[in-house]
UniProtKB/Swiss-Prot annotation:
Species, as recorded: Ricinus communis (Castor bean)
An MF annotation (GO) of this entry: terpene synthase activity
Family: Belongs to the terpene synthase family.
Name used for this protein in its record: Probable terpene synthase 11
Gene coding for it: TPS11
Entry binding sites for Mg(2+) 3: 469
Binding site residues for Mg(2+) 2: 317, 321
Other notes: Does not produce any detectable product when tested in vitro.
Keywords: Lyase, Magnesium, Metal-binding
């Protein structure tokens, strides 16, 4: 079961039933599963088949430069360390941090030697900013707020803003940082006990949002969209920063639309869905994963090329999951191991077109990287696909034999079938930062960073889709494996423990964030963003709240941010 791109972002009351093709039905799955597959997104895609807006006049380079300079000046002349930290936090949450990377790094470097204060909000904010940007930050700075028993002082309960700041910081803790483990439990309890309706509106809004989803776990592009509105309500916001964020969001959204049009054109020309009536037609959903992983404008090629690979992955997943017989799946896997066009001749007709699409798309990416960096990377890309096929085949054999794996067996295999290794290895080469002969060797074996992110993705997918898959008679998922191992009979308890496992995996992932490594920061962030996107996509799947994801998709791809006609700004 591939997870990247598998969940429908749109809910429909009349799902479209794919039409079967003439080749024989699968002995691996029953064709009845096809009838519950989500509808294609042709209607949604058609809404952006033409440009949706004219570029506003305020996107002229001189206006953007004026806004950049105004924000930069304000950042460098801020009145106090806490004001500077708050401004950095806002810049990054608004999605324009890449414009001020040098200035932010210089300022954060100064904060390393900043004397800590008795202000809980400032201490927690400093810790979070440093750690989130891969600067050294030690959790013992919170010791001054704890009593001799290692518990946070009861007097802190009155400082709700400080509690909120500490709560957000605690989500960047590692598994060995007892102060942050205690901080999460203490602040969560305190914030939940507060009477939110009695709080000031601004504070209650922030508390509710944090308890629903802490900042560290949010998808950056979606956070930028939501925070632009929040920031506009702040009485002390920075006018040039706010306008810059709005204009930048709309400009990047327009770029995303153009990329999606290019992807849809490629997908139609490829013709896999026309030839394979059982295959999913979801280029939009595949693209949304890449927006979650790397939304920045300079990663345009990465999004386009990775979307292509994910779209092909979904078709391969459908062959393994719903259509191919076990003997044919063995042939398919062997052909991919050989990786040559002659191997294709032994395949059934419906597999040949998919094999050719995979072969050509992968080699095209390899050629692109060869021209850019002088490195031959096809063997590395090919390896991710071979591993994927072998993991799919393992899952097919489990299903045919009725074998229920242990949770560890399931997760080890599920990270691969979920597409994490394929997606992140491709991303590493496509982003290009730090790609050289030395760093290429870090892709073999797969980094722990990738494995942890992939496990989080796998578990969130199961929480979001397990009930539907159980109805189809799919392979046992992590919830079932865990319940079987621990002899749990209550489904809700099984789900609770899976969520606890996800939280534990995040502490390990945070450990990778601060561990000394030659891994480029771009791929570290991509790994974190993959896990974040999984939570956004799947966290409400078991609660039947898919419409909330639908709204998020509309906000990210289709609906620009509107604002009053621009007036001259007083730039500080």
């Amino acid at each position: 079961m591939s997870m990247i791109g598998t969940k429908s972002f749109f809910i429909s009351s009349s799902p479209k039933v794919p039409v079967g093709i003439s080749w024989g039905p699968s002995s691996y799955r029953t064709n009845s599963s096809l009838s519950v597959r989500s509808p294609t997104l042709t209607c949604s895609i058609s809404t952006i088949s033409q440009p949706t807006r004219k570029e506003p006049a305020t996107t002229k380079p001189e206006i953007m430069e004026e806004l950049h300079e105004g924000t930069r000046k304000e950042l460098l002349t801020s009145s106090s360390p806490i004001a500077t930290m708050k401004l950095i936090d806002s810049i990054q949450r608004l999605g324009v941090g890449y414009y001020f990377e040098e200035e932010i790094n210089t300022l954060l470097d100064r904060f390393l030697d900043l004397e800590t204060t008795e202000d809980l909000l400032a201490t927690a904010l400093r810790f979070r900013l440093l750690r989130d940007n891969c600067f050294p930050a030690h959790s013992d700075v919170f010791g001054k707020f704890m009593n001799k028993d290692g518990k946070f002082k009861e007097s802190l309960r009155k400082d709700v803003w400080g509690l909120l700041s500490l709560y957000e910081a605690s989500y960047l803790g590692t598994k060995d940082e007892v102060e942050l483990v205690e901080a999460m439990e203490f602040t969560k309890t305190c914030l939940e006990e507060q009477s939110i309706p009695l709080m000031a509106h601004k504070l209650s809004r922030h508390v509710s949002q944090a308890l629903d989803l802490p900042r560290h776990l949010r998808m950056p592009r979606l956070e930028a969209r939501n925070y632009i509105h929040e920031y506009s309500l702040e009485s002390n916001n920075s006018p040039p920063l706010l306008e810059l964020a709005k204009l930048e969001f709309n400009a990047v959204q327009s770029l995303h639309q153009k990329e999606l049009i290019e992807i849809v054109r490629w997908w139609k020309q490829l013709g896999l869905v026309d030839k394979l009536g059982f295959a999913r037609d979801r280029p939009l959903e595949c693209y949304l994963w890449t927006v979650g992983i790397f939304p920045e404008p300079y990663n345009s090629t990465c999004r386009i090329e990775l979307t292509k690979t994910i779209a092909i992955l979904l078709v391969i997943d459908d062959i393994f999951d719903t259509y191919g017989s076990l003997p044919d799946l063995i042939l398919f896997t062997e052909a991919v191991r050989r990786w040559d066009l002659n191997a294709m001749e032994s395949l059934p007709e419906y597999m040949k077109i998919c094999y050719m699409a995979l072969y050509n798309t992968t080699n095209d990416i390899g050629f692109m990287i060869l021209k850019r960096h002088g490195l031959s990377i096809v063997p590395h890309l090919k390896r991710t696909w071979i591993d994927m096929f072998e993991a799919f085949l393992t899952e097919a054999k489990w299903f045919n034999s009725g074998y229920v794996p242990t949770l560890e067996e399931y997760l080890d295999n599920g990270v691969t079938t979920g597409g994490t290794y394929m997606a992140l290895v491709h991303s590493f080469f496509l982003m290009g930062q730090g790609v050289n002969k030395e760093t290429v060797t870090m892709m073999e074996p797969y980094p722990d960073l990738f494995s942890l992110s992939g496990r989080i993705l796998r578990l969130w997918d199961d929480l979001g889709t397990a009930r539907e898959e159980q109805e189809r008679g799919d392979v046992a998922c992590s919830i079932e494996c865990l319940m079987r191992e621990k002899r749990i009979s209550c489904d809700d308890e099984g789900r609770k423990q899976v969520r606890q496992l996800i939280r534990s995996l995040w502490t390990e992932l945070n450990g990778e964030l601060i561990a000394p490594s030659a891994m480029p920061l771009s791929i570290i962030n991509a790994s974190l963003n993959l896990a974040r996107t999984a939570q956004v996509v799947y966290q409400h799947g078991d609660d039947k709240k898919g419409s909330s994801v639908d709204n998020q998709v509309q906000a990210l791809i289709y609906i620009p941010i509107s604002f009053p006609k621009r007036r001259d700004l007083k730039l500080l």
